[in-house]
Amino acid sequence: MIKKSILLVDDDQRLRELLKDYLNEKNFQVFTSEDFDEAKEILGFFIFDLIILDRMMPTGDGINLIQDIKKVSKTPIIMLTAMSENNDKIDGLKTGTDDYLSKPFEPEELFLRINNLLKLYENVNNTELLFSFGNFIYNTKTNL
C-alpha cells in the first residue's frame, strides 16, 4: 500500500517533530517546513495528498499561501492554528481551507480529520474519471 503524503508547515519545531512522528506511526509519509517560503519551494517540486499549515508564522499569513495553492491545485488543506475565534475560522474557510483545527488539539482528532478529507477527495477524484454517454458509463482509469 502506498503511503499518503502530507506537507506539514509550522514554525514550532517541537510540534512539527511530534506530529511527524505521530502521523508516521499512522502510516503517512510526512514532509515538514518551518516557513512559507520553504513550503512554496517544496510545493514547486512535489505533489502532496494533503497539506497542514499554521496560519500565523514569522514569514506571513497562511491565508495567502492557501490562496496560492488553490489557484493551481485541488490538494486538501487543514489549517492548524492558535487563532480560535469564530471570525478567524470563517476567514480561513472563506479562502479555501478545507478544514480548520484550533490549537491545542488532540492528535487523534487531527488524524480523523485527515482521513475524512482524504476519503472525500478520493471519492471526488474517482467520480471525475467517469463519463456517461446515454446508458453507458465509461471509467477512464480502467477503460471499462
Predicted regions and their residues:
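Short, Lys/Arg-enriched segments at the junction into DNA-binding effector domains
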Residues: K4-S5, N116-L144
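The feature encodes the CheY-like receiver
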Residues: R16, P58, E85, K103
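Short hydrophobic/Thr-rich beta-strand motif most characteristic of the beta2 strand and flanking loop
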Residues: N27-F36, I42
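Active-site residues of response regulator receiver
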Residues: D54, T81
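Acidic catalytic/metal-coordinating carboxylates
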Residues: D35, D61-N64
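Two-component/phosphorelay signaling modules centered on CheY-like receiver
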Residues: Q13-F31
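Conserved phosphotransfer cores of two-component systems
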Residues: G44-F46, D68-T75, T95
